Amino acid sequence: MRLFLNLDAMKHLFAYKLTTLVLVILAIASVAARAQETSNGANAESAEEITNFDDIFAEETSTNESAPAEQSAAKSGSSGVTVLDEMGIEGEGINEAAPVDKKTKAESVKVMDATELQGSSTTIADATNRSSGVKIRQSGGMGSESKINIRGMEGKNVKVLVDGVPVDNGNGNFSVNDIPIDKIDRIEIYKSYVPERFATDGMGGVINIVTHDLPKSSITGSYSFGSFNTHKASLDAKYVWVTDSAKSRAIATGISAYYNYSDNDYEFTTPYMDTVVSRDHDRYYSYNVLPYVSFEKYFFDKATLGVVYNAMDKEIQSNSHRIEEANANAQSYGVNLSLEKANLFVKGLSAALSFSYAFCKEAVIDTSHTYYYGWDKENVREANTAFGEISMGGASHIERENQTIVAPWNFDYAFTQNPILTWSGLYRYESQDPKDKRAAKGQTLNSAGFPGHSHSVVTGLSLENNFWNERIQNVAGVKGYYYSIKADDDGEKRIQQLTDDYAENKDFGYSENLRVKLIDNLSVVEQFAVKGGYQHSLRFPTREEIFGDGMYVQCSPNLKPEKSDNFTAGAELDMRQIPLLLKLHLEFNWFYMLMEDRIYWNNYASVPRPYYNSVGTKTAGFEIDAAVDVNEYISLSYNLTRQEAESREADLAYGIAKGLTVPNIPTLYMNFGAEFHVGDLIYRDDFFKLYWLANYTDEYYYSWKVSKRQDRTIPSSFTQDLGVEYSILANMLSWNFEVRNFMDVRVYDKYGESKPGRAFATKIKFTL
C-alpha cells in the first residue's frame, strides 16, 4: 500500500512557504488591532451593544474577571523543580500547567490523564505506547535505552519535557520509566509538531510530562514488586503553613523521592545466537531525593526553591555476547528556582521564570581482562592487560563531569476578547569535561571524546485565537534558533584530531494550526470538527556529531541542522446517547513530513568517518482512534497507525537508493483496550476496575528494505495484558495486580532484540 503523494514540488514552492509565513506574521500583527477592538468593546459593553461579530454567537456566561490571567499563569510551562543531567531526571510539579483540552485546541496533541493510572503498575513508557502514532522501544528491561518514535521520527528528533523543560541528554536516549507514574498529572503528546511555547528544537514531536502538586498538607506513597526482582517505591510529603489567611499567604515545604531496582534477569534471544539464554549482569538501580520550599502570595503568586540529589548504577550487558564486569554509574546535584506571577504590572499579563543548575559526574568502566565471543563461556579470549568486554580490545575507564544551566521564561498576555499572545524562550548552557583514566596512565590513546561547551537560545512567539464561541480556533507562531558549540583540544593523544573547534548556526521556524467545529450539540452529535496544520522546524546537531569523539567519529564542523516540513489534517466526531452506546469518539488524522539534510553516520564503516548531511526522507501515514462508553460500567478503545518512511534521493556513496524504506521503523501497529469498572461495590467510596490491553505490531525491516524477499525483519507480535485494581476510602488506599504479556509471546524490538516475556507486578498506594 503506497502512502506517498507527489508533494515534493509543494515543499519547494517558495510561494507556499512565503504565504504561510505572511499568514503567521499577519496573525501576530492582529494583536494590536484586537487590543484596540477590546478597548472599544469595553466602552460599548456598558451600553449593552454588540460591537464584535464574535458576540453574535457567544453564549452568555458569568466569569471572574481575573480568570484569563490566572489560567494564563497556570498554563506557563516551565514551573516546578526539575533537575537535568546526563543520566536521569525527576521533576516536582510545584505549579502544573493548565490542562490542554484536545477538543478546544487546533494543535496536533493527544492528552493522556495519568491520574487514572496512578494506582496501577504501568510505567510512563507503557502508557505513552498505547497512543496512536507513538512507539517506544527499549533495548532491555528497567534502566535500558529507550527510543521514542512519533510518526516515523525518533531519537534526537523527538523531545522529552518535564513541565515544559527539555530533560533528555541530546542523544535521543532517555529512561522515562525512572519517573514514577504516581508523580504525573498528565502526559501531552504533540505529533509532527513542536509548539512555540516550549522553546526547544526538534521535528518529530514532543512528549511533555506534567507533574502534579499535592493540594494540601498530606503524604502519599506507593510500593510495587514484580518479576525479575523488580522493586519501585515513591514518596511525596508536603506541609503548608498559612501565614496570612486574609491575603492567602502560605509557606509550603515538602520532599519528593523515588527508588527503582531490578535484576533484569529475563530470558531473551537475539539474531546473534540460535538459543534462548537467561540474561545476567544487568542489574539496575536509581534513586532521587528532592526537598523544596515554596512561598505563596509574597508578591509572586508562587516562588519555589528546591535542591536534588540523584544517583544511578547499572551493570552493562550486551545482546551479541556475554559481559560480566563492565558497569556504569552517575551522581548528580542540582538546584532550581522558579517564580510565577499573574497580572504582572498590567491586568492579563502573566509570567513564569525559572533557573536551574545541575552538576553530574558519570563513569563507564570496562577494564576486564576477558572477552567472550558468545554467550557460552567456552569461546573466550583472555589477556594479561585490560582487554575490555563491550568491544574487543577497547578497554576504557571514562569519567565525565557535566554542568548544565537552564533558564526558561514564559510571558502570556490574555486579551479580554480571548486572544492569548505568548512569548517563550529557553537559554541552555552545557559543558562536558571527559577524562580517560587509562590514557592518563599512558596505557592507551584517549577515547573519552573532546571537552567543550555549548550555548543555545530558542525563543518562540505564538498567538492563539478563538472565534464564534470556539467554533474556529487558530494557533500561529514563529520560532528563532541559535546555538554555538566549542570544543577544546586538550593535547591528549587520540586517533582523530580536531580540524575545527567552533561551530555556530541560527535559523527560524514557523507554524499554523486551524480547527473548525462544523457541528456543535446537534441531536446525538456532540461535535464534529476538522483541522489542519503545518510547521517548518529543525534540530540542532549535537557536539559529538560536529566534533566527533576522537576515536571512531571524525570532525564535521560544517554539519547543517536537520529540517522538516510537516503537514497534518484530521477530523473528529463525538456522539452521545446513541442506540446501544452511551458515548462514541472517532478520530482520523493524516500526516506527511518532508525531511532534508538528514544527519547520518555509517556505523558499519571499517575506518573512522564523520557525520554528514545525507539524503532526506519523506514520511506519510494515517491514524484512526475510536473510544466507546457502552454504558456506565464498560468502555472500549482502539487505535491504528499506518506509516511509511522512504529516502527521497539516492546516496550512492553509502548504498542508499531513492525510494528505499527507512529501516527499524514499525509500519503498522494497533492498540486495543477493554475495561469494566464499578463504584460502591462493597463499601461506600470504593472502586473496582478490571482491564485488558493488547498491542499488535506488524513485521518490519531492521535494515534498508531492498527486496521483499530479504529476511532481516523483526517478526510481527500480538501481546496482551490483564489487570485488576481496587481502591477504598475515595482512592486513599488502592491495590493493583497486573500480568503483562500473559500469553508469554516472544516479542522482538529494535534490531531484532527480544524483550522480557510474561511478567507480574503488584502495587499498593496510599494517601494520608
Could you describe each region identified by the protein language model?
Residues 165-192:
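Short acidic/polar hinge/loop motifs at secondary-structure boundaries
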Residues 468-473, 481-483, 585, 589-594, ...:
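Gram-negative outer-membrane beta-barrel transporters
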Residues 530-535, 562-620, 641:
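Membrane-embedded beta-barrel scaffold of Gram-negative outer-membrane proteins
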